[in-house]
């Protein structure tokens, strides 16, 4: 029976096991033979390869680190909307909460920069403001319940964003803000495709630009899709309301995939370079969706849940914003979630 002779009684716990082992059938005998061969092969391999160098090469510490850039996705503050905790199972939001959350975002971004700079320098921060920064008056209930009228809200929010950008300018070698218009601050009840930039978010961007006094750069494009370059990568910026969904704050997967493929096809048709990333807000949920030639990044909302999401979907998502880190060769190397849930 092969090497069964080597399995003497000392390896058995009692006589019953010994006799049982020596009365095994053919399948069990074959299993024992295979086990013996396997053990012998393992012993042989270890004895022959003991002391050989490891498969991995030693870690190489580069003396010179590569410059990186950061992109803060900032969207859907809906300033100065008021969310009543009495109606939303404790959710709360207003202009003061928004200000504290913006301050928290500022602190976290600078903290991440300080933590990473011992490993690699951060040469620039881009802030992609992806729309719906102002609550606007397109819905009658918002016009009635907003904490301030839209004109006053615009002035107050511009001051907050200027303070944030000025703080960033003290920490980063270069800071650039890009303002994209959302759907809530539009000037008409019905959405329009012509002159979509005719929007309170557009005015907000120019207001902040006037306050900047060239301490940081501000872009306020009229483009329906604005292309912003970061570390030799092309980022397409939109608000996202053009992607139709069955209900607000749902994720229309098919529509998003179609939009991502369509923009690449359009750029090729126009003889322009393709984009590497498509960034949008609007859906109030943070999402990174990798694609073949273009990754889709959806930002969360500073506001979080409200009466509408609770009443229509019995749902609320945490207020989260995205901070991206880019490498010149590898593109996005990190996505950090800035969770603002505890800031009330």
Would you name each region that the model predicts?
Residues 1-19:
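BZIP DNA-binding basic region
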Residues 20-163:
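N-terminal active-site segment of His-dependent metallophosphoesterases
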Residues 52-63, 144-177, 181, 185-232:
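Extended active-site neighborhood of metal-dependent phosphoesterases/phosphodiesterases
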Residues 69-71, 124-126, 176, 233-235, ...:
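Structural motif
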Residues 76, 132, 161, 182, ...:
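Divalent metal-coordination and catalytic microenvironments
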Residues 83-84, 136-142, 179, 187-193, ...:
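A short acidic (Asp/Glu
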Residues 169, 196-202, 206-224, 231-236, ...:
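Conserved beta-sheet core of the metallophosphoesterase superfamily
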């Amino acid at each position: 029976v092969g090497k069964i002779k080597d399995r003497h009684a000392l390896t058995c716990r009692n006589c019953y096991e010994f006799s049982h082992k020596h009365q095994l059938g053919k399948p069990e005998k074959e299993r024992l033979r295979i086990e013996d061969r396997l053990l012998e092969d393992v012993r042989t391999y270890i004895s022959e390869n003991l002391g050989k160098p490891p498969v991995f090469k030693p870690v190489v510490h580069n003396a010179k680190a590569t410059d990186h850039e950061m992109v803060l996705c900032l969207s859907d503050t809906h300033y100065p909307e008021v969310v009543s905790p009495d109606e939303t199972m404790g959710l709360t939001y207003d202009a003061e909460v928004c200000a504290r959350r913006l301050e928290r975002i500022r602190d976290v971004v600078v903290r991440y920069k300080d933590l990473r700079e011992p490993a690699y320098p951060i040469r620039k921060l881009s802030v992609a403001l992806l729309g719906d920064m102002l609550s606007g008056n397109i819905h009658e209930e918002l016009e009635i319940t907003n904490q301030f009228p839209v004109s006053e809200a615009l002035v107050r929010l511009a001051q907050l964003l200027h303070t944030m950008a000025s703080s960033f300018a003290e920490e980063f070698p270069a800071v650039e803000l890009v303002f994209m218009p959302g759907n809530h601050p539009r000037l008409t009840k019905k959405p329009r495709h012509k002159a979509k930039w005719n929007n309170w978010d557009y005015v907000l961007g120019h207001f902040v630009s006037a306050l900047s006094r060239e301490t940081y750069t501000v872009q306020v494009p009229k483009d329906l899709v604005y292309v912003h370059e970061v570390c030799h990568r092309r980022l397409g910026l939109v608000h996202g309301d053009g992607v139709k969904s069955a209900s607000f704050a749902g994720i229309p997967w098919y529509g998003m995939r179609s939009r991502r493929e369509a923009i690449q096809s359009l750029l090729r048709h126009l003889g322009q370079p393709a984009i590497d990333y498509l960034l949008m807000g609007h859906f109030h949920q943070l999402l990174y969706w990798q694609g073949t030639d273009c990754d889709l990044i959806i930002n969360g909302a500073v506001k979080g849940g409200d009466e509408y999401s609770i009443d229509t979907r019995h749902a609320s998502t945490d207020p989260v914003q995205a901070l991206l880190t880019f490498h010149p060769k590898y593109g996005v190397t990190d996505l950090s979630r800035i969770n603002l849930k505890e800031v009330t």
